Amino acid sequence: MAFTKIALKSTVAAAGIAAAGVLAPTAFADPEALQFGQTAEVPSPGGAIDYTVSNLQPSGHNDGIWYSDVTARAVSGFPTPNIADFNARAVNSSTYANMKGNQTDGLPNQPIAMGTQTSGRVYFDVRSGTAPDSVVYRDAGGTDKVVWTD
């Protein structure tokens, strides 16, 4: 009888530990760290996109506007580049959202067919902050997914 109680308690404890492991929240992974010019695959509405980010620099008009060149290549489906998920970040962690205008040389926010690509610039308003040194792709929940730096 004592053996049965011990076996039952052990079974319940093992089941509890297993359930805790299954139900535990997934740990957040560190974002993928890349050099400017390298490519990262990111899931997007309608498919997946390989993003290549390069040339983070001031616009040259002494107005505090910075930009980065971005190429988006559709890897699967018929995805739409999500320009709103790009941010510039400074070494002091200041983060600058992209400027959501319709710049003539901006990255198009339109679906792209699988195997094709589109390129353009993503602009950031850094007028009152520290100069950025990286471009960050964040998902809709605000989690950093990819960071491009020098």
Could you say what each language-model-derived stretch is?
Residues 2-54, 59-62, 116, 129-130, ...:
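Membrane engagement elements in two modes
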Residues 16-17, 107-110, 114, 120-121, ...:
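Histidine- and aromatic-rich ligand-binding microenvironments
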Residues 49, 82-84, 133:
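Short beta-strand/loop motifs in extracellular/secreted proteins, especially
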Residues 51, 68, 120-122:
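Hydrophobic residues positioned within well-ordered beta-strands of beta-sheet architectures
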Residues 62-65, 80-82:
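Short glycine/proline-enriched turns and hinge-like loops at secondary-structure junctions
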Residues 64-76:
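Short, well-ordered beta-strand segments enriched in hydrophobic/aromatic residues
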Residues 73-118, 147-149:
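The feature marks short-to-medium sequence segments in extracytoplasmic or secretory-pathway proteins
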Residues 121-146:
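Short, surface-exposed ligand- or partner-binding patches at beta-edge/loop junctions that are enriched
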